[in-house]
Amino acid sequence: MAAAAVIEFQRAQEMLVSDRAASIDILQSIVKRDIQESDEEALRVKEQSILELGGLLAKTGQAAELGGLLKYVRPFLNSISKAKAARLVRSLLDLFLDMEAATGQEVELCLECIEWAKAEKRTFLRQALEARLVSLYFDTKRYQEALQLGSQLLRELKKMDDKALLVEVQLLESKTYHALSNLPKARAALTSARTTANAIYCPPKLQAALDMQSGIIHAAEEKDWKTAYSYFYEAFEGNDSIDSPKAITALKYMLLCKIMLNTPEDVQALVSGKLALRYAGRQTEALKCVAQASKNRSLANFEKALTDYKAELRDDPIISTHLAKLYDNLLEQNLIRVIEPFSRVQIDHISSLIKLPKPEVERKLSQMILDKKFHGILDQGEGVLIIFDEPPVDKTYEAALETIQNMSKVVDSLYNKAKKLT
């Protein structure tokens, strides 16, 4: 029995490249076969077949079949050791969730696996699955549920010795707080994660995720683009070394840093580099177009890039947030350049020069006046902008302070002399 299964398994592996469908059929027949619990070789082959079949179903995009496999193998898990069963469940669930197939069954399947782990009293497996559920809640923007389950899980993990899982949950907590714009708590959770990570060996995937989040926090909270760039570079190298699809995201954030540092000319050099060359495509092209628009101070090109590459730019919340700020700066620079020669100018004329709708130009000009970017008023009755000369700086306050300081020195000097005489 076991010998026949071994031969079939080997045949399935040989057919992986030439005929995947036939390979899947063979593996399914091995998985569905009933075996004796005492036959260790047959158990080993069935376990390998389940993992191989799961990998194949993930590669061929058969999400529903993979979800079905995860449910089907549960009775078999009682025949193998707890450690092997935990590895099998985690591997299959990770394969299913990493597909990002959006079947709508992800949370339900994850909850089913957690209930099974609870019923079987497998605490470590339950905690690992709950950490995956926190990640799933975060991905589906169910932030409150993610925080609630995450804080409950953190209390448990701090009493136990699974530091790698603790880092993972702390990192997810930081991401969730960042998504909710609670930057102080996001930074605190990240600091806790990095402190815990320093005490253990971090797998490349987890280390890359830590570096990525560190870069995001530095960019969001402190606008420290140089430090953020170095973190994104580490994250890119880490993800690239394990062929993770997140490498392209890290590369995009590196290019964003160069644009925000006002060195858009470095973007082309980065994209043409040896490491980044394999990631050439729409993702990098989008940032190249933004860099070119930023270099030329062209609002029209900037808006064209945002329209042409909507999925790559607007749908990424990190890039979208910072590009909105960049667009704002570009608009201000263009408006100041346009109004500079005038003391009184029609808003319609500014709108036609800058090729933007009049209400948007009006709104931005009024904001700039309030922020004291220039001195002027908007006469909406006549539809004109009146610009005043820069008022001379009143130095009375500075002169008064200087006089008081000098008087203080004189009084101190006289006091010291009088003290010596007495």
Swiss-Prot record:
SUPFAM superfamilies: TPR-like, Winged helix' DNA-binding domain. InterPro entries: 26S_Proteasome/COP9_Components, PCI_dom, Rpn6_C_helix, Rpn6_N, TPR-like_helical_dom_sf, WH_DNA-bd_sf. GO terms for cellular component: cytosol; nucleus; proteasome accessory complex. Residues 224-392 form the PCI domain. It is found in: Nucleus; Cytoplasm, Cytosol. Keywords: Cytoplasm, Nucleus, Proteasome. It comes from the Eukaryota. GO terms for biological process: proteasome assembly; stem cell differentiation; ubiquitin-dependent protein catabolic process. SMART domains: PAM, PINT. The keyword Transferase does not apply. The keyword Ribonucleoprotein does not apply. PROSITE patterns: PCI (PS50250). Component of the 19S proteasome regulatory particle complex. The 26S proteasome consists of a 20S core particle (CP) and two 19S regulatory subunits (RP). The regulatory particle is made of a lid composed of 9 subunits including PSMD11, a base containing 6 ATPases and few additional components. Belongs to the proteasome subunit S9 family. Component of the 26S proteasome, a multiprotein complex involved in the ATP-dependent degradation of ubiquitinated proteins. This complex plays a key role in the maintenance of protein homeostasis by removing misfolded or damaged proteins, which could impair cellular functions, and by removing proteins whose functions are no longer required. Therefore, the proteasome participates in numerous cellular processes, including cell cycle progression, apoptosis, or DNA damage repair. In the complex, PSMD11 is required for proteasome assembly. This is 26S proteasome non-ATPase regulatory subunit 11. It comes from Xenopus tropicalis (Western clawed frog).
